[in-house]
């Protein structure tokens, strides 16, 4: 399990700690764009996991159609969009070009389990 997050390092780590995500994700598998040097949709962030974990099935779960899915789609990852329930900070416009579209859409994170092989 890995995490790709865009933003300032301190801000994103405060969020990660507040959510208790390090109980589920190893710290070295958390990429914060400012510290890593690249953000989404740069291919380097996706390649990091492909190199570290070769010969795996890759799933990308996100909510920002403008940058979350385009590179993951290009790289053959299975993409899943967690649909906005009214709390997103950015507009979730699904009327984007096909390459920006997720393969799947879910209302709840628990629904992802039925997608993963």
Report residues per predicted region:
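Asp-based, Mg2+/Mn2+-dependent phosphohydrolase catalytic module
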Residues: 4-117
């Amino acid at each position: 399990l890995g995490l790709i997050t865009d933003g300032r390092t301190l801000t994103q780590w405060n969020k990660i700690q507040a959510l208790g995500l390090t109980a589920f994700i190893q710290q070295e598998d958390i990429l914060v764009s400012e510290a890593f040097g690249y953000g989404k949709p740069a291919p380097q962030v996706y390649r990091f996991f492909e190199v570290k974990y070769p010969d795996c099935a890759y799933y990308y779960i996100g909510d920002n159609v403008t940058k979350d899915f385009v590179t993951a789609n290009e790289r053959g990852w299975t993409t899943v969009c967690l649909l906005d329930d009214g709390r997103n900070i950015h507009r979730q416009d699904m009327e984007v070009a096909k390459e920006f579209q997720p393969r799947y859409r879910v209302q709840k994170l628990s629904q992802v389990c039925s997608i993963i092989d």
